Amino acid sequence: MVTFINLILGKKLGWSTVKIAASDLTDNALETTPKRLFYEIVLYSFAIEFVGAVILSFVFVPDFGALGIFEAIFLSVSAFCNAGFDLLTATPGAVGLSEYTNNPLVMITLIVLITTGGLGFIVWRNIRHYNKTKRLLLHTKLVLIMAAVMLFVGAAIIFIVEFSNQDTLGQMPVGEKILTSIFLSASSRTAGFPCFDMNDLMPFTKIIITILMFIGAAPASTAGGIKITTVALVVCTVISVLKGREDTYLMGHRIKRDAIYKTFTVIVLSLTLIAVSFTGILMCCEGMSLQKTIFEVVSAFSTTGFSVGASAEMNVPAKLIMVFTMLAGRIGPVTLMTSLIIRKNHNSDKNRILPEGNILVG
């Protein structure tokens, strides 16, 4: 957002700004001028949101008249940005998204918007220029595979667990159950559109949604969480260790150790932030449900917005902790900590040669 405002004001952007804004990306992704890169992001975003709004208008205009145009635009932007705001609950004559779970056009459009926003602009740009380059970046391949796996595995678990739950999927036809399960799986990775009361979900489903919220979507996207690439690298690293390899390999590539270090740093700092916030809220509010509290904290960290009602029961100090958790989760724990701790001159260690040390682990 700061970068976009600077462009509007005509200020120049240096590569240092771009590197900071796109620190999660590969160097190959930045083979363009800074200004063009950010103009492409804005253009892609508006184009996708416009198409989504037009499609949703075919449903909302007949239902709400001229107000339906605004509803379609707002919901399209909200879905693409993974914001999760839904004005349908405040619209006369509407109940909310739960009223449209039987409408494939609305559900599929929102799923596509949420998923597209969660892929990240580097993936859009790589796909758009595929005809010229004739190759996909390793980052793009990994994001597309992980996004599909997370979406459909999450949907399958939700479908199976909630199949007979009369408060959620139980009374729906099979086709609607499948589509709603996919929608809830997509929404759980930081979009936060509820299609029914989250308290009505089975306990195991809440655990799965908590995991999906914690993971989130892709780096450099509109979503939060620790990111799907982080999870993929952890899995690959564990497999490499079990196979006795010194390096981590993924799709025929050897992953840089810096990326592995950052991966585990992200997870440790994220879990630490969640644990500290969770403990702080329990200390501030006696009698809070453990399951509800951890659900709310992870939802805040990933900026998903799902709630089981625990936030309304919190006092002011606990709510301030939630605000800090949302802010830290949105900025990113690594970015936040490095900006506070790391000094500008960090090259001194590169010239130091120290003896190796062996420590027993596990």
Segments and roles (model prediction):
Residues 1-362:
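Membrane-proximal intracellular helices of multi-pass ion channels
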